């Protein structure tokens, strides 16, 4: 059965299907939309008591529901200076060191950090010898993405690609999955060095958005596009730890890359398949004052 599912991933018109779902998800169909949301809540056992708007009728479209806000304070941010926090609700897929420009995907599969970052060689060099973490957001999860630490945006890259599903099954069987799919790469300058937040698209993910540029995709393209941003002055975009930086319309995956020696250890319990909750401790940071 797994082989059949993977074969279908290669055969399906994934971009066409995703854009069709996107149009349906954006439509405001009144009672029909409400019925679909109620079905989704029941099917995926979503805890709506955490949502700022807990009633399905409050959402005009499926997209409004997917990108729902949480109640204030429901995800308290760990404010300790030496702690990096989880950026999303989801589950850890993999994490570990970046060795020789390679990132571990699943047993038997690695992929290139250079390819992941849209073949931006200078960016890839900045993360050599550092660490990575891949977090999967299931359809049931909260779909907004937050900053793990404070950072100032320096660059954003749109990388065209496939739209394979990014669930654990495809991660085990599709080589180079996260470096093949359409993605948006945001690079931030932090006190610990560069931080890359890679928002990976997937089958029926209707769009990827950021708080500073709005919807990045759709429309999709065939070329890599890069935007550079000032890191000082009144136009600099600085986001605090725990502040929203983007969102998915439907679940997907976030890959984070960290500079060498930015992370001391991952927090207790942070390991593959561990459930993540935005704002909780993700990693213990190196003491930069004694780095010399």
Curated annotation (Swiss-Prot):
Modifications after synthesis and translation: Is synthesized initially as an inactive proenzyme. Formation of the active enzyme involves a self-maturation process in which the active site pyruvoyl group is generated from an internal serine residue via an autocatalytic post-translational modification. Two non-identical subunits are generated from the proenzyme in this reaction, and the pyruvate is formed at the N-terminus of the alpha chain, which is derived from the carboxyl end of the proenzyme.
CC annotations in GO: plasma membrane
Top-level class of the enzyme under EC nomenclature: lyase
Annotated protein name in UniProt: Phosphatidylserine decarboxylase proenzyme
Chain positions found as Pyruvic acid (Ser): 252
Family assignment from sequence similarity: Belongs to the phosphatidylserine decarboxylase family. PSD-B subfamily. Prokaryotic type I sub-subfamily.
Cofactor(s) for this UniProt protein: pyruvate
Keywords: Cell membrane, Decarboxylase, Lipid biosynthesis, Lipid metabolism, Lyase, Membrane, Phospholipid biosynthesis, Phospholipid metabolism, Pyruvate, Zymogen
Cofactor binding description: Binds 1 pyruvoyl group covalently per subunit.
Keyword Lipid metabolism in annotation: yes
S-S bonds: none
BP GO annotations: phosphatidylethanolamine biosynthetic process
Role description: Catalyzes the formation of phosphatidylethanolamine (PtdEtn) from phosphatidylserine (PtdSer).
Predominant location category: membrane
Organism: Shewanella sp. (strain MR-4)
EC numbers on record: 4.1.1.65
Quaternary structure (record): Heterodimer of a large membrane-associated beta subunit and a small pyruvoyl-containing alpha subunit.
UniProt xrefs under PANTHER family: PHOSPHATIDYLSERINE DECARBOXYLASE, PHOSPHATIDYLSERINE DECARBOXYLASE PROENZYME, MITOCHONDRIAL
Domain of life per record: Bacteria
Active site residues of this protein: 89, 146, 252
Localization per Swiss-Prot or TrEMBL: Cell membrane
NADP found in the keyword field: no
One MF annotation (Gene Ontology) recorded for this entry: phosphatidylserine decarboxylase activity
Catalytic activity: a 1,2-diacyl-sn-glycero-3-phospho-L-serine + H(+) = a 1,2-diacyl-sn-glycero-3-phosphoethanolamine + CO2
Pathway note: Phospholipid metabolism; phosphatidylethanolamine biosynthesis; phosphatidylethanolamine from CDP-diacylglycerol: step 2/2
């Amino acid at each position: 059965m797994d082989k059949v599912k993977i074969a279908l991933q290669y055969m399906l018109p994934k971009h066409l299907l995703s854009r069709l779902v996107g149009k349906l998800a954006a439509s405001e169909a009144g009672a029909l939309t409400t019925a679909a949301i109620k079905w989704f809540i029941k099917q995926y056992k979503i805890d709506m008591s955490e949502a700022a708007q807990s009633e399905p009728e409050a959402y005009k479209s499926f997209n409004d529901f997917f990108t729902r806000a949480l109640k204030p304070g429901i995800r308290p941010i760990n404010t300790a200076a030496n702690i990096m926090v989880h950026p999303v609700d989801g589950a850890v897929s993999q994490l570990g060191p970046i060795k020789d420009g390679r990132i571990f995907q699943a047993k038997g599969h690695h992929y290139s950090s250079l390819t992941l970052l849209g073949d931006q060689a200078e960016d890839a060099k900045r993360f050599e010898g550092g660490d990575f973490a891949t977090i999967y957001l299931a359809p049931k999860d909260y779909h907004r993405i937050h900053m793990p630490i404070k950072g100032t945006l320096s660059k954003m890259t749109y990388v065209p690609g496939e739209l394979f599903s990014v669930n654990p099954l495809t991660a085990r069987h599709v080589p180079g999955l996260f470096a093949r799919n359409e993605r948006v790469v945001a690079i931030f300058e932090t006190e610990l060095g560069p931080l890359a937040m890679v928002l990976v698209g997937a089958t029926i993910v209707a769009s990827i958005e950021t708080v500073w540029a709005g919807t990045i995709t759709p429309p999709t393209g065939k070329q890599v596009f890069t935007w550079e941003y000032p890191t000082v002055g009144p136009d600099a975009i600085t986001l605090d730890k725990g502040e929203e930086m983007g969102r998915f319309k439907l679940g997907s995956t976030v890959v984070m890359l960290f500079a060498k020696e930015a992370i001391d250890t991952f927090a207790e319990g942070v390991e593959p398949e561990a459930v993540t909750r935005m704002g909780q401790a993700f990693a213990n940071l190196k003491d930069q004052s004694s780095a010399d």
